[in-house]
Amino acid sequence: MKNNIMYYYNIRIDNITQNNNNYYFTINNDNYCFTIYTRDIKESNEIYKLNKYMLSSNILVHEIIPNKDNYVVTIINNIPYILYKIYINKNKKLTINELTYLSNYTYQVDKILTRNNWNILWSNKIDYFEYQINQMGKKYPILVDTFAYFTGLAENAISYVKYTTLETQIETSDNPVISHRKINNTIESLYNPLNIILDHKSRDIAEYIKLSFLNKNTNIYQELDSYFSNNYYSEYGLRLLYARIIYPSFYFDMYEQIIQGLRKESDLLNIVTLLDDYELYLKEMYYYLKKYHNIPEIDWITKK
């Protein structure tokens, strides 16, 4: 891969290290990552435009480097790749302040990068997963045993979003902001241009709240107190936030990793053992959020 990078980007590399689909190298003390491009090819130009806008506005983000022919995506052996320069310590832990920093920025972009029809996206994902389970269920007994519970949670979240759009008004505070497809424990992916989309500001915070449960973050409510003191939420926005907290993205992410052979199926048991605590967490989070707006309750959660 080193020779390919040197050829397509006219750069000299002494050493390169591989971690899964990522190739890391350093030039003049600058760190780079050459990685497989996993987004829709049709999005690549908009991703690059957004990346240039963020850089020109002094918004922290890794910098996409076009190849020698000025293309964003480089095809090697029929596989699309992209190169970007890393601007942060990739091992630094994620904080709620990092999320807030990026969610303060809006951007007028082609709808191709916008992800705001959650109930449709979630419904389509569940339908596809149900098809997979029917085809491969015997191979994954733990997935089969847990699937109905987590799709039930997802259906609750979908209904919550549907009623939110029918019963509440969107305000200017609900405009799409810089958000992320995935949130994890370190901040390298937070500033990865391939991870950036436009969505409601509640998206990233909800994922952080769920991650806080899995990481046993005992300071989450103090962090949220600080967050809400500086970030106004409409009733519409707060209901979206709670819907996304209910939606078990951590389960479906693990589901996909298991199907792709990236994780062991037995890893699911670590989540299953936490279900009672997680239901209590959903209840506590509902009453916490209700301080800001009188959002609807879900009976089976609040009566735990």
Language-model features and meaning:
Residues 21-23, 67-72, 167-170:
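Short, solvent-exposed loop/turn elements at beta->coil junctions and helix N-caps
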Residues 26, 159-205:
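Active-site acidic catalytic loop and adjacent metal/ATP-binding pocket
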Residues 30-112:
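ATP-binding pocket architecture of kinase catalytic cores
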Residues 252-304:
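ATP/Mg2+ or Mg2+-diphosphate-binding catalytic cores
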Residues 15, 38, 115-178, 222, ...:
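ATP-dependent phospho-/nucleotidyl transfer catalytic cores
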